[in-house]
UniProtKB/Swiss-Prot annotation:
InterPro entries with a match to the protein in the record: Metal_Hydrolase, Uronate_isomerase
Protein name per Swiss-Prot or TrEMBL: Uronate isomerase
Source domain of life: Bacteria
Catalytic activity field: D-glucuronate = D-fructuronate; aldehydo-D-galacturonate = keto-D-tagaturonate
Single Gene Ontology MF annotation: glucuronate isomerase activity
Signal sequence, renumbered to the chain: none
Protein source organism: Shouchella clausii (strain KSM-K16) (Alkalihalobacillus clausii)
Family as reported in the entry's similarity comment: Belongs to the metallo-dependent hydrolases superfamily. Uronate isomerase family.
EC class: isomerase
Pathway stated in the Swiss-Prot or TrEMBL entry: Carbohydrate metabolism; pentose and glucuronate interconversion
Keyword annotations from UniProtKB, A to Z: Isomerase
GO terms for biological process, alphabetical: D-galacturonate catabolic process; D-glucuronate catabolic process
Disulfide bonds: none
Length: 472
């Protein structure tokens, strides 16, 4: 009989040596969480939503789980369709045993353990009991959204918000003052950059209405974006974010960018080069604006999105049909950063790559632009999306350590739509401590507990606290 004699999620889960155990339990375990990039709906925090069942909090927006369910043959009715919540949960429970090796298996059981005290492995055999137990617990006041945030020891949450958003939810959260965490918006102007998209012109109307600007020229667009960024800053925003397949950079002038913008405004087809000129001009404007505002600029690079056209048409975009791109961006990235650096207008920046073959491109690029008296000014962001795995996080840490300064890394973020995903910070911290422990046990790092403990504390919490200019 195969048995370890202990629960799957136990106190030393993922900690494979004594150094790792000491570092995690002494230095990382109890630190607060700064979740500086996520996709949780701020309205649910403002309303202090109470979930009726675990499907609502687990399955209603999680494309990671949806992909796994499709892979084992679950019908779409029970994924994004009109199947009822319990049916969807039972189908997920049937799927879970097949996810071993995928972080979904670890995340699922870590969340069941931390929030519901459940040690049983989720499967079709345990599904009914786990459904009932979680449903009962989710009805308790401490399992409201704000209750979960408090229990998770979250101090800061940065949501992801369109420039046209009026941020009423953030204002309500701040006004009521009941949420333990400070909740700030983050500025994501992606819709203003895709000039070739059919949605571009309608979006300009939405943005213009929010900014009270008639957007009829490139300058009026930039005016609208600046007005909205200023408003976001007044609401506590200190980060921007851009999701781009690759980072465009071509030589361009205002006249060329204006010409491309006018073609888009007239719904004429842009050439790829015209769109790149427009995007380069707008991105440089925004980066300089972020620097003026004291923000951190984030680039999430390398997602090839919405590839299954039949399914996207059926269930909508961003529903689990994305994968890694392999577009090269080393030269354009360096040219973009250099264009800002040469006039001393480069803001603090975090670079993420979805494709890990570009890890060392980013890890070496950030070293080109450090300085300004800011420790770790340009960051290689944590393993993202398909790299949000044990191997992916270890590779990101190792590549950063090999080519830069791991000790200045600002650490983990959930990038999640679920309020149970704060356990991913625990998962990350365990992997961090284990990786450092391996280096120590092999004699590659000195067994200096005081210094190692400081490094673990800094990466887990304090580097982010110092790096981001959150309101006091």
């Amino acid at each position: 009989m195969i048995s370890t004699g202990k629960a799957f999620i136990h106190e030393n889960f993922m900690l494979q040596n004594k150094t790792a155990e000491t570092l995690y339990h002494t230095y990382a375990k109890t630190l607060p969480i700064i979740d500086y990039h996520c996709h949780v709906p701020p309205q649910e925090i403002a309303e202090n939503r109470q979930f009726n069942n675990i499907s609502e909090i687990w399955l209603h927006g999680d494309h990671y789980k949806w992909r796994a369910m499709r892979a084992v043959g679950v019908e779409e009715t029970f994924i994004t369709g009109d199947g009822d919540d319990k049916e969807k949960f039972l189908k997920w429970a049937e799927t879970v045993p097949y996810t071993m090796g995928n972080p979904l298996y670890h995340w699922t059981h870590l969340e069941l353990k931390r929030y519901f005290g459940i040690d049983e492995l989720l499967s079709s055999e345990t599904a009914e009991a786990i459904w009932s137990a979680t449903k009962e617990q989710l009805a308790a006041p401490e399992r409201s959204v704000q209750g979960i945030i408090k229990e998770s020891n979250v101090k800061v949450i940065c949501t992801t918000d369109d420039p046209s958003d009026h941020l009423e939810a953030h204002q309500q959260i701040r006004k009521e003052g009941a949420c333990q965490a400070a909740v700030y918006p983050a500025f994501r102007p992606d819709k203003a950059l895709v000039a070739s998209a059919p949605s571009f012109v309608p979006y300009l109307e939405t943005l213009g209405a929010a900014a009270e600007v008639d957007i009829s020229s490139l300058r009026s667009l930039l005016e609208a974006l600046e007005k909205r960024a200023t408003f976001f800053a007044e609401e506590g925003c200190v980060l921007s974010d851009h999701g781009l397949r690759t980072l465009p950079f071509v030589d361009t002038t205002e006249k060329e960018a204006e010409a491309a913008f006018q073609k888009a405004l007239n719904q004429e087809t842009l050439t790829p080069q015209e769109e790149e000129k427009y995007q380069t001009y707008v991105l440089l404007f925004l980066a300089r604006l972020y620097n003026k505002l004291g923000w951190t600029m984030q680039f999430h690079l390398g997602a090839l999105r919405n590839n299954n056209s039949r399914m996207v048409e059926q269930v909508g975009p961003d529903s689990g049909f994305d994968s890694m791109a392999d577009d090269r961006f080393a030269e354009s990235l360096n040219r973009f950063l250099n264009e800002l650096e040469r006039t001393n207008e480069l803001p603090k920046t975090i670079l993420y790559t979805l494709n890990p073959i570009f890890n060392e491109v980013i890890a070496t690029t950030i070293g080109n632009f450090q300085g300004g008296g800011i420790p770790g000014k340009i960051q290689f962001g944590s393993g993202w999306w398909f790299n949000d795995t044990k191997d992916g996080m270890e590779k990101q840490m190792t590549d950063l350590a090999n080519n830069g300064l791991l000790s200045l890394f600002v650490g983990m973020l959930t990038d999640s739509r679920s309020f149970l995903s704060y356990t991913r910070h625990e998962y990350f911290r365990r992997i961090l401590c284990n990786r450092i422990g391996e280096w120590v046990e092999r004699g590659e790092w000195p067994a200096d507990e005081k210094w190692l403990g400081k490094v673990v504390e800094d990466i887990s919490y304090y580097n982010a606290k110092r790096y981001f200019a959150f309101p006091k």
